[in-house]
From Swiss-Prot:
Species lineage: Bacteria, Pseudomonadati, Pseudomonadota, Gammaproteobacteria, Pseudomonadales
Family: Belongs to the UPF0301 (AlgH) family.
InterPro entries: AlgH-like (IPR003774)
GO CC aspect terms: cytosol
Protein name, per record: UPF0301 protein PA14_05290
Natural source organism: Pseudomonas aeruginosa (strain UCBPP-PA14)
Source species, domain of life: Bacteria
């Protein structure tokens, strides 16, 4: 019997099924930054925190007044792990003190990317979040087996160009799925 190699979902969206009971992930779409035999890491991309970049910058540099445009740049709840730590998804090409290249996207975790965005010299498109979603080895696979998530390849247009409230339905639509037509009951055939 041929052993199949595991399928990893790096650069995919996780779309929460309607029966998702965990309040951290109910009605969310999560971008998977990493997924391998050691586990997975992702950022929820459709949960604005109520904070904006100006408020974050005021905490980082209380003596400096952030540009007015920073009041219109939302900060997202990226997940329940390390909620005091910032993560910035952006198109690859620009590098900061701490940038992880992810192919066509990159993730920066150093403060310099925030100041560059504020100054207008940072990435044109970005998604800034506090916290991340993490899964231990085998945990995400078990959740997928339990039908907790749908998956599809990530689309930068959904990440960066759509309002937060449209991202979940747009990600599901990539699969031809209307989430409002799915039952809130999970099962196996």
């Amino acid at each position: 019997m041929k052993q199949s190699s595991p399928t990893y979902l790096k650069h995919h969206f996780l779309i929460a099924m309607p029966h998702m009971a965990d309040p951290n992930f109910a009605q969310t779409v999560t971008y998977l930054v990493e997924h391998n035999e050691q586990g997975a890491m992702g950022l929820v991309i459709n949960r604005p925190s109520g904070l904006n970049l100006a408020e974050v910058l005021e905490q980082l540099k209380p003596d400096a007044l952030p540009p007015a445009r920073c009041q219109h740049i939302d900060i997202y709840n990226g997940g329940p792990v390390q909620t005091d730590r910032g993560f910035v998804l952006h198109p690859s090409g620009l590098s900061y003190q701490s940038t992880l290249e992810l192919g066509e996207l990159a993730m920066s975790t150093s403060q310099d990317v925030l100041f560059a965005i504020a100054a207008g010299t940072g990435p044109e498109k970005s998604l800034i979040s506090l916290g991340y979603a993490g899964w231990e080895a085998g945990q995400l696979e078990a959740e997928l087996s339990d039908n907790a998530w749908l998956t599809c390849p990530a689309d930068p247009a959904i990440l960066f160009d759509l309002p937060a409230e449209e991202r979940l339905s747009a990600a599901a639509a990539r699969l031809g799925v209307n989430l409002s037509l799915l039952t809130a009951q999970a099962g196996h055939a």
